[in-house]
């Protein structure tokens, strides 16, 4: 049985509230779970101490049992110091698009030509 530590949504429409639970990976998002490990209330301020509540001892127990945290839960565990989240590095994503790169190359070429023309005019 593949176990996941994941979020189960609660609350009402436009007012989300999530429970951090251990569940079988095949069960529905809000379906049956084995144990509640904590909660996350995204409606609270980011610096509020009750925004994320975790039972660290039980989280560590389930990780030792082989439960895999989802991406969002892994962020919470990393903030709490319970698990290490690998750094994601995608330098290609930060590059400008093809057209923007072409425009930048053209602007650089025009600037070089203008600088060369200015130096020739100053030399005469």
UniProtKB/Swiss-Prot annotation:
Residues 99-113 have a biased composition (Basic and acidic residues). GO terms for biological process: translation. One of its GO terms (molecular function) is structural constituent of ribosome. It comes from the Bacteria. Pfam families: Ribosomal_S16 (PF00886). The keyword Plastid does not apply. Residues 85-124 are annotated as: Disordered. One of its GO terms (cellular component) is small ribosomal subunit. SUPFAM superfamilies: Ribosomal protein S16. Keywords: Ribonucleoprotein, Ribosomal protein. Residues 114-124 have a biased composition (Low complexity). Transmembrane segments: none annotated. Belongs to the bacterial ribosomal protein bS16 family. This is Small ribosomal subunit protein bS16.
């Amino acid at each position: 049985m593949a176990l996941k530590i994941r979020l189960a949504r609660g609350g009402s429409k436009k007012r989300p509230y999530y429970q951090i639970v251990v569940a079988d990976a095949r069960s529905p998002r809000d379906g049956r779970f084995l144990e509640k490990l904590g909660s996350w209330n995204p409606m609270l301020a980011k610096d509020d101490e009750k925004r994320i509540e975790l039972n660290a001892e039980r989280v560590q127990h389930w990780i030792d049992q082989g439960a895999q945290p989802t991406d969002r839960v892994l962020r919470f565990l990393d903030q709490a110091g319970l698990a290490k989240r690998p750094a994601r590095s995608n330098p290609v994503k930060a590059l400008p698009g093809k057209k923007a790169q072409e425009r930048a190359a053209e602007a650089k070429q025009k600037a070089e030509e203008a600088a060369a023309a200015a130096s020739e005019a100053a030399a005469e």
